Every structure is written in C-alpha cells, then in structure tokens.
Amino acid sequence: ILPSGDLTNFGFAMRDKGLSQGWRGEKLDLVPLDQPEAAPVGTLERALYRPLGAQTSAVHLAGRIRNPRDEGDPVFLLGKRSSRKLVGPGLWDGLAAGMIQAGETPLEALARESQEEAGLTAFDPVKAEFLACDRISRPVRGGWMHEVSCAYAALLPEGFMPEPVDGEVDHFECVSAEEALNRIEENLMMKEAAMTLLLSIRKLL
C-alpha cells in the first residue's frame, strides 16, 4: 500500500505544474495496470488518472422504456451531455454513467450516478441487468484512457422521463432503436454509451 500522504503530495505537485485535468476533489482506487483485479494500492485524485494513464473503472446504464403496444419496438432514453463537460461535450450518452469512486462497488456507483444524473431516487440497481465488463485502452485528450467499463440495462415504466439533476446532462430524449443506431453511426454518442446500448439491443434480438 502506498502512503496516502505521498500520493496526495504527488497529486498536488502535478496540479501545480498544470499536469492534471482540473481538480475535482474526487478519489478513485489506484490499482496496478498489470494486475487489474488486485486490491487497490491507494487512492488518487480523479483528475490525475488520464495524464498518468492509470486505470479507472466506470459504470454505464442503458435505459429502456416499456412499450406495451409493441414490445418489438424498444424505446431508449438518451441524455445530452452538457456543453461544459470536459470530455465529450454535447454528445449523447446513456441514461447514467460515471466513475466508480474509491471504496465503491459497481452497483453502488450505478445507484449513485442514476440519482445524481437522472434523479432516479427509487432505482434499485440490483434489478438492473448486467451486460458485460470490458477493458478499454485508447488515447484521449490530455493522456491515455485505461478503463474497466461495466455495462448494465434497466427497463423503466411506460411514460417515464428522467430530469437532469447535477448539471452534467442538458436534457433527455426518448428515441427508437433505429434512431439510437443512427446517432452511433454518425459519431454523436459517447463510445462507452454506444457499446452499452448495442449490448442492450443485442439482448432483445
């Protein structure tokens, strides 16, 4: 285990040199890249992970509205990301998504993000359908993204429409599977949200 004080001082030094992506005051578990399933060796400020190429973990939720008139024509909920977002401003996202914070389980993160971004106060993450966990590795602005992305799907009541809560989502829309696929094809959707949506659609086939 790395001393928390050393990691904190290291983080402040990176920030003071302008090497961090802002500063969020949010800690994530730090795990070795070559041992992604190992216990965390410490925690580090979220804004340092991409510049360092350190591994993060995230959850993504695809929301589908029940359509009793035509179960073969699914309706999905997409959120328009705020123009103020550092990553993917203005792109389309799933119902909820976010980093797994230090000490959280994926389901705990799913419940928190669902409430923070979409106001789902009564959402039970245990009822969400697990789709897959994938490892992502690609260059991003200001660094490198190494991430374990956990995808889930949830069926929501007919007529349900979430309300943006924390300002990270501009608004939500209900779209057909065809329209969602069009937005993916036109590169209007976040890559991880697109992957989650495609997995959800495939489950329905």
Which role fits each region the language model picked out?
Residues 192:
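Anionic ligand-binding catalytic core segments
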Residues 164-168:
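Short glycine-enriched loop/turn motifs at secondary-structure junctions
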Residues 174:
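Short aromatic/basic micro-patch
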